[in-house]
Amino acid sequence: MKSLITLLFILIFFSFFACQNDASLVGGKWVESSFRNVQTDTCTVLLSTLLSDSLATSGDTVCQIGHRKDALWGEITASFYAEYEVPSVSFDESIDYLFDSITIRLYSSGDYLGDTLVTQRISMYPLTENIQLDDANYLYSTSNIAYDSQNPLSSFSFTPTPGRRSKELEVRLPDEWGKEWFNLLLEDNRVMESQTFFQNYFKGIAFIPDMNAACVNGFQVNDSSFCITLYYHSLTEVITEKELVFNASTTLTFNKIEYDRNGTPLEDLQSGDDNALSTSLSNHQAYMQGMTGMYISIDFPHLNNLCMEGDLVTIESATLQLYPVKGTYGAMYPLPQTLSLYTANKDNVTQGVITDLTGNSVQTGNLVVDEVTYEKTYYSFDLTSFLQTNLGTTGYNRQKLQLILPDNLFFTTLQ
């Protein structure tokens, strides 16, 4: 999927009532109404890009692995870390067993960033420290776990399969690795007795991309994907093929994301709620991106100017239209079907979601796609209630909006 969603410009349409206290002559034949219905699309809207300090990526069911560098977005490297769980098995001492092979199986998640025509390469390194959650029971896109970079366990090459979630990739691992594990299991060695002993013997794997790669690829993480399977057979009258599966932990896994934006329109972007990067400093565009933590702040600095239209002004309806930059999306890089819109205070601290006028349904943006020229593709939000609430407010009481990818994309993809 496309690296970033860029918003070139937005339109907001207002319809409001204004009541003027105009004096009329006593005894006039007609009484003139002091109410006016006005429609305008000239309300100033300011966009800026914000960057989260880090994102929780532990235990997700999708991960990203790869490397990409270009002039617009900079350099992005995504790696994956996983602890493995030892299976429970018992062997009949009267039967002989022979090792066959050991493999790792991965399934694509279908999403990607970059050139999918180039062969990609991933290396697997043994961890030298155990993966541990923090006090809040999370691991993050910025977490660091040491691994032995001088002694890879294995490496493999593959061709990306964009959009194909069911595509299986099974890679044979070194027999020496498999035989060592198999013999420990046959011997009923202590390291295979429990997860506690096993994780001290084998702390896990770091999946590191080749730095010459041109694509970041998404993979599923579950009991079928990222599993290490040890194949063996029993020597009886009838040879019986068997297998043991070492699954990746459901909690002690995480995605690490590294980036370098030097020389790009976003090189001045710093993390933190108080470090918003104005569109005037980023080619007059605002940006969203999953996993690196970019999202958009939307402000209405001159909203209260509407109050000058009369003594009593009320907003009847207001619609916000957000236009993605042409050329940043298409058949190969589809736009998200939904976006999330939140309210925030003046310090960009998130407060709540934007709902419809009834307050019951959360708005996710009505996506209108121009299939012909792609000039008029936009997301539409009803901001009537939000602007009614904020009209006339100042200072700490004034709210902003935050536009963010939905959680399933923001925390697991580089869309």
Predicted regions mapped to residue ranges:
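Secreted, disulfide-rich extracellular signaling modules
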Residues: 2-7, 13-415
